[in-house]
Amino acid sequence: MEACTSTEVLQEILYRYAGLRRLDLAAEVYDLFVQMCPVVFPVTLADTDRARKLVTGRRGLGVRDAMHAAVMLNNEVRVIATFDTGFDALAEIERLSLA
């Protein structure tokens, strides 16, 4: 599969750079990320339902990681490239370390 992302990740990019008052970078990073990841999954009610189950199932994930994991699992994406070791708690997802 090509590189993919979700609307949640794009929201996080905007949130982070807006919080830093770097709106110029918010737009630039957002656009570059969309170019790198041509597949963008929406976040649906099914995703938030699955994230709720992951969080309340005490699988060791934070809410944001659970949301990302739910979108991945619901779209049959099983590999993530990230620094975030929280994904190691999920047997269904393989984490490619960026470290």
Label the predicted regions.
Residues M1-R58, L73-N74, L90, E94:
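PIN-domain endoribonuclease scaffold, especially VapC-family toxins
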Residues A69-A99:
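Acidic, PIN/NYN-like endoribonuclease modules and their adjacent C-terminal/linker elements
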Residues L61-G62:
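A beta-strand edge to alpha-helix "cap/lid" segment located at domain peripheries
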Residues T7, D65-A69:
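Conserved glycosyltransferase catalytic-site signature
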